[in-house]
UniProtKB/Swiss-Prot annotation:
Record-linked PROSITE patterns: NODA
Protein name: Nodulation protein A
Organism annotation: Mesorhizobium japonicum (strain LMG 29417 / CECT 9101 / MAFF 303099)
Principal EC category: transferase
Its biological purpose: N-acyltransferase required for nodulation. Acts in the production of a small, heat-stable compound (Nod) that stimulates mitosis in various plant protoplasts.
Family: Belongs to the NodA family.
Amino acid sequence: MRPDVQWRLCWENELQLPDHLELSEFFRKTYEPTGAFNGKQFEGGRSWAGARPELRVIGYDVHGVAAHLGLLRRYIKVGDVDLLVAELGLYGVRPDLEGLGIAHSISVMYPVLQQLGVPFAFGSVRPALRNHVSRFCRKGLANILSGVRVRSTHPDVYLDLPPTRVDDNVLVLVLPIGRSMSEWPAGTLIDRNGPEL
């Protein structure tokens, strides 16, 4: 039986301190099983990991936050082409609801993507999530690009690390919104020009 999830679409400046605290707890519990550092970045009420989203879709049920997806419009560089996209990230589903799937979050976000008039939405996920996102892509709304590296800045300055990092072990998810997939630029390197969402 599908849980009764109510979706809230909110701009970042509409969130209040209790919202950030609840989301921070949600992200710690959702991301810690993938590695202690992944949960640590949400300590102290922080409800974002790298870049801060401008818009969020938050699913709630009787137990609190059930799911989350963030959006940030930005220009990325694909090969030699500058491209406006809506980056989708900070995706999470509470562990007891893992069957809820990314399709539910994106279906709530999709009309907003159309209203924003962006040509594409894009995000990157760990290869371990291939089956998870493949189910969504079978519906024809998105495409998985493999063999694409993604360069990002670190969200903070670390004296022992270079200012950028390149992920060459990610899957890139592209949703054509205002353009067709055939208009996505060719290239094997995406430069975020900032931290990951």
